[in-house]
Swiss-Prot record:
Source taxon at top rank: Eukaryota
Organism annotation: Homo sapiens (Human)
Recorded name of the encoding gene: OGA
Gene Ontology CC: cytosol; membrane; nucleus
EC number assigned by the record: 3.2.1.169
Protein modification: Proteolytically cleaved by caspase-3 during apoptosis. The fragments interact with each other; cleavage does not decrease enzyme activity.
Full protein name: Protein O-GlcNAcase
GO function terms (MF aspect): [protein]-3-O-(N-acetyl-D-glucosaminyl)-L-serine/L-threonine O-N-acetyl-alpha-D-glucosaminase activity; beta-N-acetylglucosaminidase activity; hyalurononglucosaminidase activity; identical protein binding
Length: 916
């Protein structure tokens, strides 16, 4: 019905236009000059439009644009967004997802009845939360501007959307080719004239809506030719575009580090109006390894009186945008009335706010903020403090989505993303009603559940936090100065107090959907049998393991998380500190080398002290990963897990590498020199650490997709110590027995002596072990140059083995164990020099079968190869029995390939190699 009604309306309008010669296709399509800002504009035919606010000032548009490339948000996420926007006093949502195919690629297609119902529901929800819903359409990929049928198709599409209740619109011509087709070139003098013509026509057709946005093709300073002030394109837009139409602008660049006041004044002059900023500071669709959890930054509050609005285009992952939107709201509210800085500073240059900003930035790696009204670091801390409450509230969407590391997940719940519906199918929000694995301290953010008296006594006493994290209603009626003063006073406190866990305040922070689901808890809770009810709670004995309880996410965890995933052009203070420390430890590692001449005890002590602090910082990352993985709110976890998994994995490698640097015998100068700016490379902080490792190009080892089911298990890779020998031998024996089924009960050390003993004794510098909570469960061993290693073996290791194992009688048929014993008494074959020139290093790796995480083996191989390449190796090889299919497959998955047989190769082994 919705479609039919909109089509009928369009037919009536087209009949009116056909009777009007001025509006016919034969009329000139060149747009007239835009009337003066105060001049009346003729009303269009669109009956669905809302009258403009004549004579009244338009409100400042501030909110979110869903304009990224990637899987669009689902409807329930958008409704949750509206709730948050209202709570934080923002007012606008621009619907423009690039991968909604009816928004961009197939813009001509009308919405189906089902899609129409969803859009109407969404528009209604926005109205309920007092959020202005702006529908954007991007016809620029293939529209013929001079074709009346194309223009009519666009009108028909927007007519349909207006029937849904939408009153605000946007035409986007971003990221398209500048060249016009031959038909358009005959009618329009330039690309800008064509765009302005159709924009003006649509604007008037819809009745000149109060909010109508236009995104130019030259939407940032770097896209303007030859520059902003001399751009013919922007000049045409400024002169011809009707004054009631606002222009979107991203700043000096597509992703602008800063948006100076001068740059806005420059573009405003040529487009003859104040722009609306489409801000990509938190957008991550251009780099699938990066996430941005830092504050809104680099935009002075002096911009507010010079703009018509700011819409942030944030991360693709919805739940990762809490900080981005919250800090934008803080920025906006800090100068909501558009007060100029010179007015603020007239009373006192040393105002309370500026003093607090100086205090907040003391000892910080960041530049001291000069904006007297807004401090990014203060805004970040406020956002993280409020966000912390969300982690303890059990919640997840019914269609769970876990994006893999690297490329975004292309299939969710078995449904390919190709030709996905333009409006996501209705997604029902469900709340997980199972008791989360939480420690007693987790109560600060947990689901309000009924506790027994005994449990209530165990809960720690908590105070409400006397900051802006209090009930939202208390701030609704306060003026800006009161709010600002309260923020400053609260931030002067030395420590943040625990958050209020009062059930009423928790309930107020929840979405209506969550509250509704909680009302129905009895309907969906799993059935409890009499047997379960009568069963006493298990209490472990004195010699048994205690019950596992997960620690809750802390504010320090979120601060560290934000620092690791900060902003496009900079890392957070802790992330930058870790990067600098690793660079210093790597560059100065020669001072702790055993063979270092002229040792300086002070330098050695400094290196070891800084290494210990760095390892401690790496440990904080592991702890943050564990607590986040165990958090009750799985919705947040699923959106961020792949990113946290990546940083955890790379920091595990880096920590192991630093430990190796501190205990090796040889110094090396194989490291890269010179530091680049953090934003010069892709991949964020994890990418920066990867590039500082010697094997930075081994992308297959660094590509470690997270498990389908999030896990908090953490493995440790560290250098081998002599005390670990028995554990390594045990793993070697168990895995060998598992492969051939021949236990060596009478000689338990035999297989270990054969496969790993020489490396453990003579090549200690290149040996690593894998540990979990139960002990050692894997090893990675190597030697940088096998030729001198074999010579050492002949001198010391082989004679010791010959003495330990008597040479068996070769006249009889030998057992597997006897064959290994005999090998110690036979001449060792030497590999060809032509082969060793390219693959000089010998490696041996194995992991216990209980380890099921495939990323662990990649991390171990990365650590081993990093140590070898750091000391000049060009390649590594390993020797495998032809019948050992398990280990052959194991090495193949780690990037090793079979070397073609050549003269001098042993006949009873397969040689696999890997270039470094």
């Amino acid at each position: 019905m919705v479609q039919k009604e909109s089509q009928a309306t369009l037919e009536e309008r087209e009949s009116e236009l056909s009777s009007n010669p001025a509006a016919s296709a034969g009329a000139s399509l060149e747009p007239p000059a835009a009337p003066a800002p105060g001049e009346d504009n003729p009303a269009g035919a669109g009956g669905a439009a809302v009258a403009g606010a004549a004579g009244g000032a338009r409100r400042f548009l501030c909110g979110v644009v869903e304009g990224f490339y990637g899987r669009p948000w689902v409807m329930e996420q958008r409704k949750e967004l509206f709730r948050r926007l209202q709570k934080w006093e923002l007012n606008t949502y621009l619907y423009a997802p690039k991968d909604d195919y009816k928004h961009r690629m197939f813009w001509r297609e009308m919405y189906s009845v089902e899609e129409a119902e969803q859009l109407m529901t969404l528009i209604s929800a926005a109205r309920e939360y007092e959020i202005e819903f702006i529908y954007a359409i991007s016809p620029g990929l293939d529209i013929t501007f001079s074709n009346p049928k194309e223009v009519s198709t666009l009108k028909r599409k927007l007519d349909q959307v207006s029937q849904f209740g939408c009153r605000s619109f946007a035409l986007l011509f971003d990221d398209i080719d500048h060249n016009m087709c031959a038909a358009d070139k005959e009618v329009f003098s330039s690309f800008a004239h064509a765009q302005v013509s159709i924009t003006n026509e649509i604007y008037q057709y819809l009745g000149e809506p109060e909010t109508f946005l236009f995104c130019p093709t030259e939407y940032c300073g770097t896209f303007c030719y030859p520059n902003v002030s001399q751009s013919p394109y922007l000049r045409t837009v400024g002169e011809k575009l009707l004054p009631g139409i606002e222009v979107l602008w991203t700043g000096p660049k597509v992703v602008s580090k800063e948006i100076p006041v001068e740059s806005i004044e420059e573009v405003s002059k040529i487009i003859k109006r104040a722009p609306v900023i489409w801000d990509n500071i938190h957008a991550n669709d251009y780099d699938q390894k990066r996430l941005f959890l830092g504050p809104y930054k680099g935009r002075s509050t002096e911009l507010i009186p010079r703009l018509k609005g700011v819409l942030t285009n944030p991360n693709c992952e919805f739940e990762a945008n809490y900080v981005a939107i919250h800090t934008l709201a803080t920025w906006y509210k800090s100068n909501m009335n558009g007060v100029r800085k010179d007015v603020v500073m007239t009373d006192s240059e040393d105002s309370t706010v500026s003093i607090q900003i100086k205090l907040e930035n003391e000892g910080s790696d960041e530049d001291i903020e000069t904006d007297v009204l807004y401090s990014p670091q203060m805004a970040l801390k406020l956002a993280l403090t409020e966000w912390l409450q969300e982690f303890g509230v059990p919640h997840q969407y019914s269609s769970r989505q876990v994006a893999h590391s690297g490329a975004k997940a292309s299939v969710v719940d078995g449904t390919p993303l190709v030709a996905a519906p333009s409006l996501n199918a209705t997604t029902v929000v469900t709340t997980v009603y199972q008791e989360p694995i939480m420690s007693q301290g987790a109560a600060l953010s947990g689901e309000p559940t009924t506790l027994t008296k005994e449990e209530e006594k165990k809960q720690p006493d908590e105070e409400p936090m006397d900051m802006v994290v209090e009930k939202q209603e208390e701030t609704d009626h306060k003026n800006d100065n009161q709010i600002l003063s309260e923020i400053v006073e609260a931030k002067m406190a030395e420590e943040l107090k625990p958050m209020d866990t009062d059930k009423e305040s928790i309930a107020e922070s929840k979405s209506p959907e969550m509250s509704m689901q909680e009302d129905c808890i009895s309907d969906i809770a799993p059935m409890q049998t009499d047997e379960q009810t009568n069963k006493e709670q298990f209490v472990p004995g004195p010699n048994e393991k205690p019950l596992y309880t997960a620690e809750p996410v802390t504010l320090e965890d979120l601060q560290l998380l934000a620092d690791l995933f900060y902003l496009p052009y900079e890392h957070g203070p802790k992330g930058a500190q870790m990067l600098r420390e690793f660079q210093w430890l790597r560059a100065n590692s020669s001072v702790v080398s055993v063979n270092c001449k002229g040792k300086d005890s002070e330098k050695i002590e400094e290196w070891r002290s800084r290494a210990a602090k760095f390892e401690e910082m790496c440990g904080l990352v592991m702890g943050m990963f564990t607590r986040l993985s165990n958090c009750a709110n799985r919705t947040i976890l699923y959106d961020m897990y792949s990113y946290v998994w990546d940083i955890k994995s790379i920091m595990s490698m880096v920590k192991s590498f630093v430990q190796w640097l501190g205990c090796r015998s040889h110094s090396s100068a194989q490291f890269l020199i010179g530091d680049q700016e953090p934003w010069a490379f892709r991949g964020g902080l994890a990418g920066e650490f990867q590039r500082l490792l010697p094997i930075d190009g081994a992308n297959d080892l660094f590509f470690q997709p997270p498990p389908l089911t999030p896990t908090s298990k953490v493995y440790t890779i560290r250098p081998y110590f002599p005390k670990d020998e028995a554990s390594v031998y045990k793993i070697c024996r168990e895995m060998y027995d598992d492969g051939v089924g021949l236990p060596f009960q009478s000689q338990p050390d035999l297989i270990g002596d054969k496969l790993v003993g020489g490396l453990l004794s003579l090549s200690l510098d290149y040996c690593f072990v894998l540990e979990d909570e139960d002990g050692i469960c894997g090893y990675a061993l190597g030697t940088v140059d096998v030729t001198p290693f074999i010579k050492k073996c002949k001198i010391s290791w082989i004679p010791f083995m010959q003495e330990k194992y008597t040479k068996p009688n070769g006249d009889k048929e030998l057992s597997e164990a006897e064959k290994i014993m005999l090998s110690f008494h036979e001449e060792q074959e030497v590999l060809p020099e032509t082969f060793l020139a390219n693959f000089p290093s010998l490696i041996k790796m194995d992991i216990h079968k209980k380890v099921t995480d495939p990323s662990v083996a990649k991390s171990m191989m990365a650590c081993l190869l990093s140590s070898l390449k750091a000391n000049g190796s060009r390649g590594a090889f390993c020797e495998v029995r032809p019948d050992d299919k398990r280990i052959l497959e194991f090495y193949s998955k780690l990037g090793c390939f079979e070397i073609a047989k050549m003269e001098g190769f042993p006949k009873d082994v397969v040689i696999l190699g890997r270039s470094l």
